[in-house]
């Protein structure tokens, strides 16, 4: 079974070293680079360039949702074979800590992330870049898979839904294999 390894690093030199170490792992079919959401375009471009310089494997770049449209073209120009739209959005809530409310921030997962992802997927698809588009975020149903494909994705990633229903990716793949495109 082919494996795509997800990597996340803020430092191009360290990322390059990691890519060089894992590049020849048997069964590894590709790499996915998660770009830092609090970084900038120059850093994103540098990370993609360094990673692609170290490998012959296809590199997918997972874009932060807020920057997806703005960074997509630069990622492809730097060597990305595919774009993953995208990373989970960030949220916050207030929790008591030693009698005082403090903010707790983190990634938001679940079906409600789908609409946010789909909006960015549509925007990136409109750029008509020469790469694969992979939808990721809030996909829990076959109908959502169809919507992502209709919006321009060639593939989907199932993230948090597998925590709740581990068999879901296989079920969706079977449905996909026997289905017709949305609208037919």
Q: How would you describe each model-predicted region?
A:
Residues 1-42:
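Active-site beta->alpha loop and helix N-cap motifs at the rims of alpha/beta catalytic domains
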Residues 1-5, 52-64, 124-136:
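Short beta-strand/loop segments at the ligand-binding rim of alpha/beta enzyme cores
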Residues 7-8, 40, 61-64, 109-113, ...:
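Glycine- and other small-residue-rich loops at beta-strand/loop junctions that grip anionic moieties
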Residues 13-21, 66-81, 122-130, 139-158:
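Catalytic cores of alpha/beta
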Residues 23, 48-56, 76, 121-128, ...:
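Surface-exposed amphipathic alpha-helices with a cationic face
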Residues 33-43, 72-131, 168-171:
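Glycine/Thr-rich beta-alpha phosphate-binding loop at enzyme active sites
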Residues 114, 170, 174-184:
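Extended, intrinsically disordered, low-complexity segments
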